[in-house]
From Swiss-Prot:
Binding site for ATP: 34-41
Protein role: Part of the ABC transporter complex TauABC involved in taurine import. Responsible for energy coupling to the transport system.
Compartment annotation: Cell inner membrane
Designated name of the protein: Taurine import ATP-binding protein TauB
Reaction(s) the record says it catalyses: taurine(out) + ATP + H2O = taurine(in) + ADP + phosphate + H(+)
């Protein structure tokens, strides 16, 4: 279980987060939603171990987070892939750093590429792939080291609407099949409502958790209900509009 308690943080000398607490249990997909500048990415970087909080505690399975670790796989908004490596060797990169044998990391990387729908593209270079395919490589690379927690920082924000929905479906399929703890950062309200088993709404910066919502639309997809049927369901539309209203309410506080 991920446990974040009483987290305070600064970014570039300014307050970014104030007293943020959250938990992610095994099999839970938590989405953090908020406007630009609310500290969403700072929160993810703290959990990933890339930054140190001003105050508060972060633990994963009761072990304090003190720096980056293979226990926490990260998928970046800009993919963070190595252009001089082909697809399969990008996926192998973390395994290579961990000291896995060449044969075993190739087997693992090919398995992950198959999981994300990229079988047959292992020897393509990154510049030969579409944006959605590059994000699939990023997800495969993060999963290859078998992390306890998967962290995704606005991974689908630069994709077109059709590809974004495909990637949302892929993420829910991975969540269903692996049972991993997942934390996703987004500013897209429909995406947040569709994916989250728990949705945390952050206030404009410095970010504080102002709403916690339990949702089941992602679970419905994982159980076989089509994405389009879910997103056109009046219940989904009503919840999306409710969250939109809460977001606008937070923005109006600043005016």
């Amino acid at each position: 279980m991920l446990n974040v308690s009483g987290l305070w943080a600064e970014y570039q000398g300014k307050p970014a987060l104030q007293d943020v607490s959250l938990q992610i249990a095994s099999g839970q997909l938590v989405v953090v939603l908020g406007p630009s500048g609310c500290g969403k990415t700072t929160l993810l970087n703290l959990i990933a171990g890339f930054m140190t909080p001003s105050a508060g505690v972060i633990t994963l399975d009761n072990i304090p987070v003190s720096g980056p670790s293979a226990e926490r796989g990260v998928v970046f908004q800009n993919e963070g892939l190595l252009p001089w490596r082909d697809v399969v060797s990008n996926v192998e990169f973390g395994l290579q750093l961990a000291g896995m044998s060449k044969e075993q990391r190739r087997v693992t990387a090919l398995k992950m590429l198959n999981r994300v729908g990229l079988a047959g593209f292992e020897h393509h270079f990154i510049w030969q792939l579409s944006g959605g395919m590059r994000q699939r490589v990023g997800i495969a690379r993060a999963l290859a080291v078998d992390p306890r927690l998967l962290l995704l920082d606005e991974p689908f924000g630069a994709l077109d609407a059709f590809t974004r929905e495909q990637m949302q479906e892929l993420l829910l399929t991975i969540w269903r099949d692996t049972g991993k703890q997942i934390l996703l950062i987004t500013h897209d309200i429909e995406e947040a409502v569709f994916l989250a088993s728990e949705l945390l709404l952050l206030s404009p910066g410095p970010g504080q958790v102002v709403e916690r919502l339990s949702l089941n639309f992602g679970q419905r997809y994982a159980e076989g209900e089509p994405c389009r049927a879910i997103k056109s369901d009046p219940e989904f539309i009503a919840r999306r509009e409710d969250v939109l209203g809460k977001v606008f309410q937070q923005r109006e506080v600043l005016i």
